[in-house]
Amino acid sequence: MKRILKAISILLLAFLVGCSGTKEETKVYTKQQKGVTMELTFYYKGDKVVKQTSKNTIVYADLGLTKEQVKKQLDPVAKKYQGIEGLEDKLDFQETQVVENLTIDYTKAKLSQLKGIPGITIEAEDGQDVSMKKSEELLKQQGFTEKK
């Protein structure tokens, strides 16, 4: 009986130690400029960004363009996002706007592959972590505000 209790205690201790790691947190940043609303969500542990999502909404009329004109401009760019591990991009062309949902899983993506893609800015190199602190500084320089 003592052996069973001891084994259970060791398993519980191992489980608690495993769960006591840095908790994943999120921060959301937004920016609006003519015809475009951007919302970036960062998932991070400590200073390490593990995932980033971006929801971009583009209103055709605000840009003075039609749905077809915007589609013609965005489709070739979206093709560059395809087939890259850790990167997922979806465009939803609606009647009055297009909504882009972009996800970067930094635990799977190779940063060197992401750097050559239009619209993606990364300061880190392969093998390095994407820093939440540096990301925040860059976003603030670009006019993003944190959504609380």
Describe the residue ranges of each PLM region.
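Sec-dependent signal peptide recognition
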Residues: 3-10
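Subset-of-secretome marker
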Residues: 22-148
